[in-house]
């Protein structure tokens, strides 16, 4: 089995590839090769039971993905994107990478022909939904994004559905919750503070909170995000039907509930490292995001996430900090 990971140098891509290296198989099929594409070289896991190839390329340019698709990978995991804040700040770059990149990928698959029909897992986002919201967004809620990033992902979902309907590939779109707690340094995502206010205090560093304590959002851990990819790659897609884009399960919490969970897990000294510095730009972006979901379809189809924000924090401590933190 040959797996192509687009955006393989990013956090979720790295963790997905590490999971593949650990398991050595996917859905009961042995993995022969993993190709990790990105604009920078992806690092190989410490030990891989398969051939690993890191390819540096730009799928947002015409023909930028053709050579990779010519290899006819069995599974394509499309993670390549720029994040929400950057897509909002740079309109042209956002559409070039988040939309043109997906369109070039889908067309490259279509043009191979000869019965080639890979599984394509496309990572979308809950940013495809826009206000006004219900208290809980049901699976039937319409997509009216209020950011450029959300619009780019919504268009990608439509393309995925149509190319799947036409038989060019077997696509599954997964709308990721905000992935929290993200390891590493802060990125340009408008949602980055959700992770920052947990990660930095646990590392003994101060974190900036730019929004109100009452902001509510939908979260899942990096561990769950990898689990979503694994399940989307291996599931029986006949059970999905024609509605190929699914809202992933997660846990809804206010910022205040996040902080209280951190207090329960790590103590008051850690919580005191959070500093409130309001940012109206971030606040405005987040105000247009959904807060809570009733993700019935994905749960019925076997997708799983954490059941509390305390669990999300403990996953981060276990997976990234070796079970310890700075008290």
Which residue ranges define each predicted feature?
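NAD(P)-dependent short-chain dehydrogenase/reductase
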Residues: 161-217, 222-227
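Amphipathic terminal alpha-helices
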Residues: 290-300, 307-327
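NAD(P)H-binding glycine-rich loop region in Rossmannoid oxidoreductase-like domains
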Residues: 59-97
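Conserved C-terminal active-site "lid" loop/helix of NAD(P)H-dependent oxidoreductases
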Residues: 43, 222, 279-303
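Mid/C-terminal beta-alpha module of Rossmann-like enzyme folds, strongest
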Residues: 201, 224, 228-286, 325-327
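Active-site Tyr-X1-5-Lys
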Residues: 131, 146-172
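N-terminal Rossmann NAD(P)H-binding glycine-rich loop of SDR-like oxidoreductase domains
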Residues: 1-26
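Conserved Rossmann-fold NAD(P)-dependent oxidoreductase catalytic core, especially the SDR/UDP-sugar
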Residues: 103-147
């Amino acid at each position: 089995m040959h797996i192509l990971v687009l955006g393989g140098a990013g956090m979720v891509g790295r963790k997905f590839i590490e999971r593949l290296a650990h398991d050595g198989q996917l859905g009961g099929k042995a993995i022969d090769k993993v190709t990790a594409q990105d604009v920078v070289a992806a690092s190989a896991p410490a030990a891989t039971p398969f051939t690993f190839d890191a390819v540096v390329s730009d799928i947002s340019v015409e023909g930028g993905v053709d050579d990779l698709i010519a290899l006819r990978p069995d599974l394509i995991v499309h993670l390549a994107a720029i994040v929400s804040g950057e897509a909002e700040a740079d309109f042209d770059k956002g559409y070039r990478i988040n939309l043109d990149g997906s369109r070039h990928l889908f067309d490259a698959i279509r043009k191979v022909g000869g019965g080639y029909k890979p599984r394509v897992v496309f990572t979308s986002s809950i940013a495809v939904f826009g206000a006004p919201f219900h208290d809980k967004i049901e699976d039937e809620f319409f997509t009216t994004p209020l950011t450029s990033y959300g619009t780019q992902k919504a268009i990608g979902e439509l393309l995925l559905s149509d190319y799947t309907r036409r038989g060019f590939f077997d696509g599954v779109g997964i709308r990721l919750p905000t992935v929290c707690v993200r390891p590493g340094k802060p990125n340009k995502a408008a949602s980055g503070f959700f992770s920052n206010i947990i990660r930095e205090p646990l590392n003994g560093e101060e974190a900036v909170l730019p929004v109100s304590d009452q902001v509510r959002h939908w979260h899942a851990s990096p561990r769950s995000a990898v689990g979503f990819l694994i399940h989307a790659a291996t599931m029986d897609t006949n059970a999905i039907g024609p509605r190929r884009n699914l809202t992933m399960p997660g846990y809804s919490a206010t910022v205040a509930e996040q902080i209280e969970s951190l207090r329960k897990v790590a103590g008051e000294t850690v919580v005191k490292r959070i500093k409130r510095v309001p940012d109206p730009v971030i606040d405005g972006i987040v105000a247009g995001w959904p807060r809570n979901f009733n993700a019935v379809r994905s749960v019925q189809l076997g997708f799983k996430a954490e059941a509390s924000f305390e669990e999300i924090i403990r996953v981060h401590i276990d997976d990234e900090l070796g079970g310890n933190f700075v008290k």
